[in-house]
Every structure is written in structure tokens, then in C-alpha cells.
């Protein structure tokens, strides 16, 4: 009994507390402030209560719930649509489970933009149980259980078809843009997005992707494209859109919609995107077209697309 109690009083207990409750390391200024409060009489139980009642914990809880739900859907063989999330949240509780649930047991998995990913999402990736999990990013980050590769999406250091599936969660919109907020270079190259998509088509058999969408001019740090514009980019890079779904942040929360509200702009309704496009992309080939035709023949009554000529009218 003495060892657990000693660990609770140990200075390192703050590291464990932040990791378990908030899913991130404690920042130096937080440690300094918290140690001062503990010295002034704050109990560790009171500290735990404060963390659990924080908005940051609520965000982590929503993501953990979403990742756990996606795992259950995946085990049941479901490809969920109509995912929902409450008002006041960003797009993560919708886009992350949408993609994770569609993992199909591939041996080699690539994640694009892992360095700044949500901890709950990284846990979800590790929980896929893929024999080989690789993360690629311009920035460097160490994630236990994931092979880290520092590289440019426009020139990936991988062989053709090396990965069974790639994940790109709210990442592609930043390619070729001003990424100084992430400690990276300032750029403004619209052609970079096409180059990154071509590389992802080259190295992976499937791409599970999410992108914020809406109207308005491009932001310094990201592209702003409407749903059909995104699909045009995907197809121009040599993909076919196997499945897609649009989500919009409404008064009731995040909901699946057949089309976006007119004039919808990034960031006007919540802390992140006002709408997000989730899609499964596959390299354009005769085999994929045949698989798509068979799928539509067998499941023609199920909605598969909300964009393109085969979307329901």
C-alpha cells in the first residue's frame, strides 16, 4: 500500500496525471504553477477534480468516446454514416471515427500529418492493430508504436503501393500553405495540393481523407474549397471517390447533410471548421471501377455519395 501512496505524492505524479486525464504532457509553466499551488495547500484530489471538470478534459472525453465507438463499429463490420457530435465542438469527433471505422485490416498503414494529431486519434491508430504503422510529417514527433518519417508529402520516400491504406485527417488543406504556426515554412503554392494527392495515390491502395469545406477565399494557413472543388482535385490526381459524406455544424450539433448551407464559411459557427467532407478514395483503375460497379449493384439502395454525378438528387 505504501508504494502507490508514495507515487501519488511524488513529483512525477503530475506527469502521470496530465497524461491520463488530458492525454498530453504537462507544460513547464503548468508544472510551475501547479507545484506552487500544491505547496500553498491545494490537495491532489482537488487538483484531479479541477482537471476532470475542465473544458480540455471534456474535449478529450468526446474524442475518446468517438474513437471507442469507431472501434466497435469496425469490429461489427459497419461503415457508419450519419455520425453526430454536440454543438460547440470542432470537427474531430465526426471525422476521426468516420475514418477509423473504415480500416479494413491492411498490413501497412500510413498516417499523414501525425505530428500535431490529437492524442486520442493516435491511440485509435495504434488500436487498429496494424502490423506496420508509419507516420509522415514535415515536423518531427516521436510516438511509441509508430514509425516516424520526416518528409514532404509532395515527395514521399516510399515505394509504389507500399501501403494498404493511408489516413489524412484535416491535413491536405495545409499543404503548400503558411505553416509558420506549426514551426514550419511559409508557402503559397496552390499546385502543392495536387502533387501531394498524386503521391498519396502512388503509395497507397486506399486513402481515407477529411478536409474542411465551405465558401470564401483561401486562408494563409489552409486552402478553402467547396465539396465539388475538393472532388475535382481528388479526381484530377487520379482517384475515384468510392464513398463520401458531408457534415455541417448546425444549431443541433454536427450532422450529415446532402449539401452545405449557402455562404457557409470556415470558423463562423464554432472553434474549427463549419463543415467537413469525409471521403474514401481509391486509385482510378479498371479493377476499382469493377469493384465499385459490383458494390452499387448489391447495395444500390444505400447512399454512397453526396458529391458528383452519382449523388442522390
Q: Can you say where each PLM-predicted feature lies in the sequence?
A:
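Residues lining the SAM
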Residues: 169-172, 210
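A C-terminal cap/extension of S-adenosyl-L-methionine-dependent methyltransferases
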Residues: 128, 141-143, 228, 232, ...
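A conserved beta-strand element that flanks and buttresses the S-adenosyl-L-methionine
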Residues: 167, 176
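A short glycine-rich, Lys/Arg-flanked "PGG" loop and its adjoining helix->strand segment in the class I
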Residues: 184-208
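Acceptor-substrate binding/catalytic loop of class I
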Residues: 191, 209-233
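Class I SAM-dependent methyltransferase SAM/SAH-binding core
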Residues: 108-155
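Class I SAM-dependent methyltransferase Rossmann-like catalytic core
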Residues: 62-106
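Substrate/cofactor-recognition hotspot
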Residues: 1-62
Amino acid at each position: 500500500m505504501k508504494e502507490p501512496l508514495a507515487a501519488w505524492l511524488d513529483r512525477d505524479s503530475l506527469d502521470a496525471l496530465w497524461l491520463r486525464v488530458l492525454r498530453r504532457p504537462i507544460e513547464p509553466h503548468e508544472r510551475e504553477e501547479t507545484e506552487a499551488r500544491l505547496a500553498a495547500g491545494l490537495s491532489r484530489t482537488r487538483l484531479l477534480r479541477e482537471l476532470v471538470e475542465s473544458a480540455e478534459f471534456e474535449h478529450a472525453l468526446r474524442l475518446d468516446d468517438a474513437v471507442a465507438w469507431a472501434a466497435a463499429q469496425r469490429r461489427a463490420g459497419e461503415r457508419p454514416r450519419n455520425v453526430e457530435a454536440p454543438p460547440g465542438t470542432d470537427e474531430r469527433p465526426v471525422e476521426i471515427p468516420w475514418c477509423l471505422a473504415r480500416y479494413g485490416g491492411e498490413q501497412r498503414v500510413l498516417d499523414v500529418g501525425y505530428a500535431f494529431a490529437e492524442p486520442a486519434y493516435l491511440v485509435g491508430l495504434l488500436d487498429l492493430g496494424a502490423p506496420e504503422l508509419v507516420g509522415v510529417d514535415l515536423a518531427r514527433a516521436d510516438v511509441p508504436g509508430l514509425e516516424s518519417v520526416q518528409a514532404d508529402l509532395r515527395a514521399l520516400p516510399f515505394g509504389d503501393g507500399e501501403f494498404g491504406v493511408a489516413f489524412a485527417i484535416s491535413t491536405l488543406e495545409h499543404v503548400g500553405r503558411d505553416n509558420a504556426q506549426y514551426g514550419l515554412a511559409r508557402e503559397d503554392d496552390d499546385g502543392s495540393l495536387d502533387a501531394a494527392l498524386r503521391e498519396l495515390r502512388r503509395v497507397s491502395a486506399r486513402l481515407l481523407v477529411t478536409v474542411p469545406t465551405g465558401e470564401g477565399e483561401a486562408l494563409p494557413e489552409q486552402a478553402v474549397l467547396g465539396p465539388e472543388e475538393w472532388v475535382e482535385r481528388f479526381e484530377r490526381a487520379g482517384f475515384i471517390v468510392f464513398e463520401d459524406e458531408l457534415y455541417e455544424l448546425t444549431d443541433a450539433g454536427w450532422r450529415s447533410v446532402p449539401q452545405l448551407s449557402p455562404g457557409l464559411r470556415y470558423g463562423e459557427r464554432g472553434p474549427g471548421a463549419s463543415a467537413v467532407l469525409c471521403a474514401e478514395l481509391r486509385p482510378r483503375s479498371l479493377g476499382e471501377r469493377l469493384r465499385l460497379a459490383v458494390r452499387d449493384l448489391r447495395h444500390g439502395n444505400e447512399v454512397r455519395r453526396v458529391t458528383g454525378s452519382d449523388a442522390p438528387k
